[in-house]
Amino acid sequence: HPANSYIYLYGNMDMEERLNWMDEEYLSKYDEIPVTSQIGHQEAFSEIRNVEMEYSVTESEPEENNSYLSYNIVVGDSLDVERSVAFEILDYTLLSAPGAPLKKILLEEGIGKDIMGSYEDGIYQPFFSVIAKNANPADKDRFLSLIRSALEDIVKNGVDKKAIEAGINYIEFRFREADYSSFPKGLMYGIDVFDTWLYDDAKPFERLKCLDIFDALKKKADTGYFEELIEKYLLSNTHASVVVVNPKRGLAAEKEKALADKLAEYKASLSQEQLEKLVADTKHLKEYQDAEETEEALKTIPLLKREDISRESAKIYNTEKHVDDTLVLHHEIDTNGIGYLELLFDMKYVPEELVPYMGILKSVLGYVDTEHYDYGALFNEINARSGGILFGISVFTDSKDNQKFTPMAGIKAKSLYKDIPFVFEMIKEILKTSKLEDE
C-alpha cells in the first residue's frame, strides 16, 4: 500500500504532469489508511552500559589479542544536521586523519593493532564510536580511560584548528563533487534525504542543504564549538556503551547445531498432513521461481528502441599542448569549479629489480614527514585546500596492439581552480623532500 512508502522524483521533468500521472495511475486507486511507522526515541541510560559478546573464528585463527573493544556514544538525533556534520568532521579530526590524536594515543599505548572511528547518522539517534581491533579484553578499562583523558586534554587545549579546517574542506569537497561512482546520483540523493525525512515529514531536504552548514562551521571553528560538542556528548554523556567482542572457536558450529536442533524439534511437532503441505508448498515455490516468464509478462518490460540511442558518440575534449618536452592533454569540460590533475611518469626508466618497490613507494608518499611538515600536518594541509593527492600505478594498453602495455607511475589530484598552484607546490614538496629514510 502506498501509504506505507516514500516516493520521490529526481531529474529535469514536468513535475506537475508526473504528479498527475502518478495520482491517476497509482495513488488514486487506494484509500488512505493510517500507518504507524514513527521510530521511537530511546531514553538515555543512567550510566554507561557494558556488553560482552562472542564471534566465531576458525581453528587456525588466534583467540589471544583478537578481540574488539568499542566505545559507543549516542549523539542527540539526526534532525540537527549541523551537529551531524560537525561530528563527521570530529570523526575525521580525532580518528581518521593520519596523526589523529585519539587514534595516535591508543596505538602508542598498545590498545589493539588498529583503531577505527565511525559516526553512524543514518538512524534516528546517531552514535559515535571508537573501535580497537585485535585487542586484549583485559585492556577494556584502560581503553576507556585513555579515550576520556585524551578528550579531556583536547577540550582543555583546543582541537587542532588546521585539522578542523581540513575536515570541513574534506567533507564539503565531496558534497560539492557528488561523485557516487557507478551509483546514480538521484538514487544516492534519495538515500540521503531519508536521514531526516523518515523522522520528520516536514524535513526531507535538510541533508541536501549543507553548503550553508559548512560556512557556519568554518565560522564556529574558533569559538569553542567543537570543544563544547566533545564535552557535552563524548565526556558528559552516559547514553553510551562499552562493547567487548571476543573470539571463540567452534561458535559457528554451535549455532548451526542449535538451529538444526530447533528445526528438528519444529519438524517433530508437525502432523503428517502439515509435513506434506510444507513439502508441496516448497515444491510449488521452486517451480514458480524456475518457471520461464510468459510472453505476455515479458512484453510489459520497457525496452529501448534503436532510435532511442543516439548515433553520435560522446565528444572528446582533448587539446594537445607541449610544455618544454612534456605532452599536456587539456580537457575543457564543465567540472563544477573543480580542477582535476593527473601526472604520469613512464616506468620504463625504473630498473627491473626496483619495480616491486614501486608498490611500496606509492603507498608511503604523502604519509611520511617532509622537509616542512610532519605527516599529520601534511595530510591536513592538503585536505584543507584540495580534494586530495593520490599516488598510484596504472598499466595502459596500446590502442593499436592489445598485446603491448605501458606501466605508468601516476599522481592524481583535485582542487578548486584557485588552488591548483597550491597542489603543484604540495606535489613538489612530497616528491622532492619526503623523508623516506624514516622507518
Please place each PLM-identified region on the residue numbering:
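M16 family metallopeptidases and their MPP-like homologs
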Residues: 4-10, 66-76, 103-218, 238-248, ...
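An aromatic/glycine/proline-enriched structural segment found at the starts
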Residues: 6-66, 157-160, 178, 263-267, ...
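Terminal amphipathic helices with adjacent charged low-complexity linkers/tails
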Residues: 34-35, 243-263, 267
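His/Glu-based metal-binding/catalytic segments typifying zinc-dependent metallopeptidases
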Residues: 35-99, 129, 184-207, 269-366
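C-terminal helical/tail subdomains of lipid-metabolizing enzymes
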Residues: 210-213, 217, 256-274
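Core subunits and conserved enzymes of cellular information-processing
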Residues: 230-233
